[in-house]
Amino acid sequence: MASMMQPQIILLKEGTDTSQGKAQLVSNINACTAVGDVVRTTLGPRGMDKLIHDDKGSVTISNDGATIMKLLDIVHPAAKILVDIAKSQDSEVGDGTTTVVLLAAEFLKEAKPFIEDGVHAQNLIRSYRTASTLAIAKVKELAVSIEGKSVEEKKGLLAKCAATTLSSKLIGGEKEFFATMVVDAVMAIGNDDRLNLIGIKKVPGGNMRDSFLVDGVAFKKTFSYAGFEQQPKKFLNPKILLLNIELELKSEKENAEIRLSDPSQYQSIVDAEWNIIYDKLDKCVESGAKVVLSRLAIGDLATQYFADRDIFCAGRVAEEDLNRVAAAAGGTVQTSVNNIIDEVLGTCEIFEEKQVGGERFNIFSGCPSGRTATIVLRGGADQFIEEAERSLHDAIMIVRRAVKNSTVVPGGGAIDMEISKYLRQHSRTIAGKSQLFINSYAKALEVIPRQLCDNAGFDATDVLNKLRQKHAMQSGEGASYGVDINTGGIADSFANFVWEPAVVKINAINAATEAACLILSVDETVKNPKSESAQGDAAGAMGRGRGGGRGRGMRRR
């Protein structure tokens, strides 16, 4: 009787929304599956694009998984995990963002029937982690090294990796053209990890084929004062001076007080201001530099002064561009014009100012360090150029990863089918429920070739049956067979040069499995009402302030 009289224990604030148990887990799985369905159709060379229109009126056309996930304003807490893994895949390897979201959604979809039948989530998580370890080991075993090849052979192999990535993008029609450009750019910077050494500059207008690669640095002409017309626009082997100071005549307006005993002294004060700027300009000229760049303003006086002495100058150069010139030309950015020595000056074979479309560009080519490159992108609509830039970023990341890791695997769903077959065979050696869970993981991996077929308009069931038959061959010669997008059948992905770096697949399997396990491990969601009640209180206070307090027990005046 005493136990029945115990008062109710209230832990959470009134209005807190809690949901738990099997229904909550299934709800989270459904939300993640819905997110997977959004990006599903963007996979592969025949994938469709998404047009996203935000509240500010800007329009984005993209089929890049990470870009779409960022722009979708997802509010479901579990589904946000898929947004995070897409972002991490993009920053880590650059490509495979749609793949990682699709795999995570498919792992959860396959887990759903087991959860509904009462299987404990931890049993699934344990089996999924085991399957993930086996899958990654198999990818490493099947990967082919590109180490030890000649430079030309290596370039050819890397171009194939870049072309595989670009084939699913908006610029897929010119994938060979851009793949070669990307490989040349990555090879130019060597082993340097700084991604900003490869610049991408967009110039609206013209054709995609009008895009070109600068073996050095190119940036849009900065704002110039009167007098720049007389400056030379081309130099051979010039010395380049990089500054981070203003070269502008400025009168001291604040914190300045001058007391004169004689009016004739006034002129000497004015002359001193002029002498300071002329002294700076003289030192720049004495350094022997023919090109002067500064991150801060170079005024009209300095512009005309340099023009009279056949020196080119540009002020307000973006910090990123200035640093890239320093890396390429071998100079050092100076914060003073005193004691400028030859060692701090950069150089290049050719400097020229050139018209590109409706813009003028300053181009430094043939730089001694050769550790920078710039891709100048041309195209019609702004949205098209934006998407082309994202596509090239993905391709650059992929090639850099392939250079570093030096291993590639067959694309077109071939590696996914081979891992799936391997896991099915392995599951037969395991007794108990775990056999079913690993088998469902293996089935989920088939989503990649199946979706490639669906997006291309082929009969996925027929193609998958052919692939299963080919991969089941004991000799192992069918291990590299994947979907042939051109014929609607199957083909050897290695022979067709459909390759991708092994690190992309390893990262995708790892991230997708971790995300699926994370969502499966959540059994309760608690929604705190604090923010909502705070907004309600604020609104109520405003209402009372406008006389809304009447009828609430307040005395009328």
Swiss-Prot record:
Its main location: cytoplasm. The keyword Cell inner membrane does not apply. Pfam families: Cpn60_TCP1. GO terms for molecular function: ATP binding; ATP hydrolysis activity; ATP-dependent protein folding chaperone; unfolded protein binding. It comes from the Eukaryota. Transmembrane segments: none annotated. One of its GO terms (cellular component) is cytosol. Molecular chaperone; assists the folding of proteins upon ATP hydrolysis. Known to play a role, in vitro, in the folding of actin and tubulin. Heterooligomeric complex of about 850 to 900 kDa that forms two stacked rings, 12 to 16 nm in diameter. Interacts with KNAT1. Belongs to the TCP-1 chaperonin family. This is T-complex protein 1 subunit eta. The lineage of its organism: Eukaryota, Viridiplantae, Streptophyta, Embryophyta, Tracheophyta. The gene is CCT7.
